[in-house]
Swiss-Prot record:
The gene is XPB. It comes from Trypanosoma brucei brucei (strain 927/4 GUTat10.1). This is TFIIH basal transcription factor complex helicase/translocase XPB subunit. Residues 627-781 form the Helicase C-terminal domain. A motif (DEVH box) lies at residues 515-518. The lineage of its organism: Eukaryota, Discoba, Euglenozoa, Kinetoplastea, Metakinetoplastina. ATP-dependent 3'-5' DNA helicase/translocase; binds dsDNA rather than ssDNA, unzipping it in a translocase rather than classical helicase activity. Component of the general transcription factor IIH (TFIIH) core complex, involved in spliced leader RNA (SL RNA) gene transcription by RNA polymerase II. TFIIH has an essential role in transcription initiation. When the pre-initiation complex (PIC) has been established, TFIIH is required for promoter opening and promoter escape. The ATPase activity of XPB is required for promoter opening and promoter escape.
Amino acid sequence: MILGPGGRIFINHGHPAYPHLMDFLTACCEPVCRTLYVSEYTISPSSLSAATAEGTYSMEMVRNVIRYFRLDEQQQIPVDVERYAALERRVRDSVQDTSLDLPMEVGEAKVSANGDVKAEEGCEEATDELSPLAGQVKKEETKEVAAEPRRRFLSLSKRISAKSEPLVTRAVVNTGALQPLPADLEQMLREEENSSRVRIVLQPCLRPVKRRAVGGDKQHSDEQQCQRAEETKLAYFLTSPDRNHMEHLVSRLQDFLVPVLLHGTRRWVVSDVDRGVEERSTAESGRAKTLRRLFEAPSSASGRSVASKSLTNEGANGDGLGGGVGRRCTRIVYKSQVMDGKMRNVRERLYKELSVRADLFYDYVQDHSLHVCDLELSENVRLRPYQVASLERFRSGNKAHQGVIVLPCGAGKTLTGIGAAATVKKRTIVMCINVMSVLQWQREFIRWTNLSEDQVTVCIADKKQMPGDVFITTYSMLIARRSNVPEMEQSADAKLTAKILASVGEQPWGLLLLDEVHTALAHNFQEVLNKVKYKCVIGLSATLLREDDKIGDLRHLVGPKLYEANWLDLTRAGFLARVECAEIQCPLPKAFLTEYLESQSDGDPFARRGTTRMAHSVVCLNPYKLWCTQALLEFHRNRSPPDKVIIFCDQIDGIQYYAQHLHVPFMDGKTSDMERENLLQYFQHSDNINAIILSRVGDVALDIPCASVVIQISGLGASRRQEAQRLGRILRPKPASLDNVCSYFYTLVSQDTHEISQSYERQSWLRDQGFSYRVLQSDMVLQHFLRTGGKLCCVGPPRWWYECAGPSCDSAVAAKGTYWIPFSQEAALRMQSRFVAGVRGCDLTATVLRDTPRPPELKNMGVEEKWTVCFSDSCAPETFGTVQLVEGNPLLVRRICCGPLAVEHDCLHGGEECLQYAVQQMKVMVAKNSKNRIPLTT
């Protein structure tokens, strides 16, 4: 690693030491830029706080990792990578197999059964091979310990304190490469190490100390029952080992704390004995123990453990060789109880006003309440390595750490959240962003756990169930403002909703899962953290990004970031699909460019940032975007097998505009939940449709594993989060086929507009994750489309045609194996308006049909003209329905279709009339929306 100013770290992925640093980078550093060959990280106070909260890395370990793996000016590191790899394997094997007693320090002595101290067999030779000096030191120290067998443990602990070197020093071959840390980084580590650590601990309530009354055994039995009830009750306590510091904090937090009546005196701070079960009596194993043995000096790790072990053994057996459990380490702490429901307020005030980061953890092993026996993963579940790593961070030390887990879209965040719930095995409540996400979580809980359908309940508009062992609902359902209507006047549905929400707020919950946690920063969503009585909260997100710079509030609202996966690493491992990203630049036709420039008037100070309605409409309804989308749809429709395409458009008018011209179904904010579910199911499982248009409702919590192509027409300004979320819709790996080797992400931008700069900003975060964008011109896409026989759709006035037997007039054209006669423009406009409105048909009178050419069959019939149009439900664009030319005559029924059928028609070349019509329609839509105050996006 290369250490830069301000805690910046640059990593070369090709260096052989990179695999050994991945765990350190994930746990202790914040990713800034992770590309294919080089990554940039930063060490900040927040990342160090998250590392200490997770519990694996101490500041001494962080310091040693940087010192021993830092490149010097000659591009050399102090350790030999091969020796370090061999040492790491030995340590890992000794951790997994307790019979392999790898010494914690150089030359550790081993005590035999008869009390003699002997050098450990099998380790001396390996030690001498790694360091000749170590072997000599070992022999001398063995003699020293053997000389005083009765004080072997005390001598051993003294020797360790004198030799404070971590195991990683055995792999050092280039001592000249060891460099001191920069002053700013050393100061940062020292502040984190020496700062007063304040914790918020969920633990049993304080037991009242009472004298035993003279009243007899019955009263004593009642007191014992009350005492057991008090022990099972949990509460949050603000704890600190420094009494003065604690009293200072309490003086600023009395609004959220509960005083204790002790010996007739009300006290805000009480002392207690912290037995430290979670830190001292629980044996470390696995990853944490391996890392501590490698990078922590024996004086701070092994020495304490050996000394405490000697005290324990001597206390149990008297001769120092027993295996019983003796005295435990204790210490005095000072605590103050937090009011119910005010824990978040305490953390927020500590962080914002007092600059104190309070760690929060939940000892779910000691808590026997809210237990759900069936909440465990099914036998057929096999978690992926990164999911296991994230859950290890969550349950480090057999305690549930509150925080955020960041995994890419399509990487299995839902299953990871289910794994967290199965770890604590407590009643769980899940908060989702929308109804589709609620139903998805319900299906996944039933699929991956042993829970029955009755145990997993939901509360949405169309399906309301009382809370079960696992309860799933939306943020908006829980915090919605409801009118104060008398209970007698409420409907049955309103009463049921009130009953469910009251039950949610009254019942305690073991785990609160926040899906898409970056949305929980909104003011209303923060109310969820106060309304739900949870013991531990975990946030899940794919993009921990917000453009309002409030993402840092997650540190005190939810907790530190426990784990963040590398997108490129998951792609290389095959867990995510490989994605080809392209930016297609589309020029503006002259008429559209004129309107865009006119909207940049001096009278509107915001116009140059592209915030006017006209500017948004011009760049969204750009005809070149429409034609490029048509060309891309045709290209991916002809692949083997055909690709499923998602088209994203944020503007309301744009969604309907593209849906009408491309004949593709769309889904926006007005689409009902039932229609959304049916449309998505039809899109995933039907071969008749390969594309769908989505508004902003499809950005998050939308599971469409079949999709492999995204075409983005417009977006929410320069939102990096939206860009990443939309790309995440196609990250699910697909079965290999002839053409399906990767996924495709296209973003269409209008040249010479604000979209160029916004697009570059939107792509910045994905570029930092290793994705690259190819810049293409629309001419290249359209030339390929036209060369393969494609025909661009018309943006001019709607053209409707009816079928005829032959070329009975000059305007008849041959297409689709027959002849077609055009309707008049007035008739076409009426048919188009009815068709767009979803009406099943319309009548055309003689006045409307004035300029429409008649077929030969209607000549000299002498009847009043009234044509009846009936639109088709499912056959477009092959046929759009039928028209009955004469009422009651089934022989005069003709098919109708829409679109430019004339071969010579081309809006791209010489279609000025069509472009002018498109501009006029755009102006009408902008004026209508401005008058009705319709928002730009939905």
